Amino acid sequence: MSSIDRSQPVGVKTYEVRTYGCQMNVHDSERLSGLLEDAGYVRAPDGSDGDADVVVFNTCAVRENADNRLYGNLGRLAPMKTKRPGMQIAVGGCLAQKDRDTIVTKAPWVDVVFGTHNIGKLPVLLERARVQEEAQVEIAESLEAFPSTLPTRRESAYAAWVSISVGCNNTCTFCIVPALRGKEKDRRTGDILAEIEALVGEGVSEITLLGQNVNAYGSDIGDREAFSKLLRACGQIDGLERVRFTSPHPRDFTDDVIAAMAETPNVMPQLHMPMQSGSDTVLKAMRRSYRQDRYLGIIEKVRAAIPHAAITTDIIVGFPGETEEDFEQTMHAVREARFTQAFTFQYSKRPGTPAATMENQIPKEVVQARYERLVALQEEISWDENKKQVGRTLELMVAEGEGRKDGATHRLSGRAPDNRLVHFTKPDEEVRPGDVVTVEVTYAAPHHLLAEGPVLNVRRTRAGDAWEKRHIEKTAEAAKPAGVMLGLPKIGAPEPLPVATGSGCGCD
């Protein structure tokens, strides 16, 4: 373990939150951090590796072997806790909601287990575990308070998640998350807009509207056009430069949403819409309430209204019963759709889902072969689509931590309006994350673009000011924020993908 300077004011306790899974969990972890800081804890320095006084695991139940990963990480902390009796370990998130009765049995050194519906209880549960000297397991079966009413420690100074709903009313057969996060519950529009306006007042210039099934917003109040109205309302907020959303369901993707995207200047020309399969037979088995023609029809309408839109998707390969003909239908749909990028997953059983007990589970070697064919096809399409960007002039929002080789190549990185990742030559003039630069694209790779010429223009922004202020004011009590561009699944070189049951949370 590296040597960490843990010097803090006497009596001040540090915390670390480890996040696994989807965007919902990332945003929930911001809330967990806010709750702990509100209770007097201080964030541990980056790289503390379990050296904090409180370590919180915010877990995912979608990824294969999520259980093994959690217990492996918990096991590595057991010796540290033996040496430091005052240390506390908490486990929350979807896996905690699912395995509430087994976590403390398998890892008796865990102090707190909490679920997806009661994250606001974490500080109280930690204190109760300390006083009573026994593990506290508290799982709520329904939402106690809308999470966005809780304190939040934002990870980025210039971009932010804004939750508009929680839960999901869909019943996809591969997905366990609706059972863990509950039925859909929408926030009041006024509360959402008030949060966005407050964020913009703090310097944020990009927001991502977040929901398990984001474009179903309004379903519990009976307004089928509530989401498109919300997009248009975002367009009226001064200082808000970029609006994104994730993830929509094709069933609820209506013409009024497409019109709002096209007619609201700060709604970015980008759509991440999970297809999951191109086979009507498989889509029916998945209990997805659309078919290939419907999905491709939505894409056609989006491109007619927004010609330069970048469209990305999620696809599951090897769903139970998928034949070679079914897989060829997926390949056909990918050729027709010409996605900017596809996040492709190999199906694996997830206990508790209907698909796990379906007949005709596909052999691993068949799934792997199909996966490789699909990835190769999409790589070719991604590269072809990116080549069309060469010669275009783009406005990029400068990002922090997006380019792994920026230091060695003397480049910076940013996101185009359509969320493509662009590496550009570092200008003589200082630019900060959150600032906007204008560049000309000179080269295309499958997962990124290059702008190797001089930067054409630099626009310093309030978002850049906010990043600089936070950067300067960081102290030992407030470690440097990650500053990642929060938003949709990114268009860029993907991380190595583990076998999984579905995309993201699996219910979009």
Swiss-Prot record:
Would the keyword tRNA processing be found if you checked this record's keyword annotation? yes
Identify the domain of life.
Answer: Bacteria
Task: Please list the residue ranges annotated as the MTTase N-terminal domain.
Answer: 13-131
| Domain annotation Radical SAM core: ranges | 154-385
EC number, UniProt record: 2.8.4.3
Q: Which GO terms describe its cellular component?
A: cytosol
Catalysis: reaction(s)? N(6)-dimethylallyladenosine(37) in tRNA + (sulfur carrier)-SH + AH2 + 2 S-adenosyl-L-methionine = 2-methylsulfanyl-N(6)-dimethylallyladenosine(37) in tRNA + (sulfur carrier)-H + 5'-deoxyadenosine + L-methionine + A + S-adenosyl-L-homocysteine + 2 H(+)
Assembly, in brief, is: Monomer.
- What is the purpose of this protein? Catalyzes the methylthiolation of N6-(dimethylallyl)adenosine (i(6)A), leading to the formation of 2-methylthio-N6-(dimethylallyl)adenosine (ms(2)i(6)A) at position 37 in tRNAs that read codons beginning with uridine.
What protein am I looking at?
A: tRNA-2-methylthio-N(6)-dimethylallyladenosine synthase
Please give the organism.
Streptomyces avermitilis (strain ATCC 31267 / DSM 46492 / JCM 5070 / NBRC 14893 / NCIMB 12804 / NRRL 8165 / MA-4680)
Q: Which gene encodes it?
A: miaB
